[in-house]
From Swiss-Prot:
InterPro entries: LCN-type_CS_alpha_beta_dom, Scorpion_toxin-like, Scorpion_toxin-like_sf, Scorpion_toxinL, Scorpion_toxinL/defensin
Described function: Alpha toxins bind voltage-independently at site-3 of sodium channels (Nav) and inhibit the inactivation of the activated channels, thereby blocking neuronal transmission.
Location relative to the cell: Secreted
Protein's name according to its UniProt entry: Putative sodium channel toxin Ts17
Pfam annotation, one family: Toxin_3
Length: 86
């Protein structure tokens, strides 16, 4: 009986929650957003426009990196960037 109550409580706590992820946001062509000049303000705004918690310019790759993106928002995969292909 205790396991059943625990299971019900666990289901109620997770119902309706949307997962969040971190990563490089992309358009449909798998191209990430460049941030020349290490513009953290640009990346933070871009990420927040995509409903992320925050973002910054990752200087090693010169790309915007977001924290807390919604699961439905596409992020960079291991494939190559294909400009113009949506």
């Amino acid at each position: 009986m205790n396991y059943f109550i625990f299971l019900v409580v666990a289901c109620l706590l997770t119902a309706g929650t949307e997962g969040k992820k971190d990563g490089y946001p992309v358009e449909g062509d798998n191209c990430a957003f460049a941030c020349f000049g290490y513009d953290n303000a640009y990346c933070d705004k871009l990420c927040k426009d995509k409903k992320a918690d925050s973002g910054y310019c990752y200087w090693v790759h010169i790309l915007c990196y977001c924290y807390g993106l919604p699961d439905k928002e596409p992020t960079k995969t291991s494939g190559r960037c294909k400009p113009g292909k949506k």
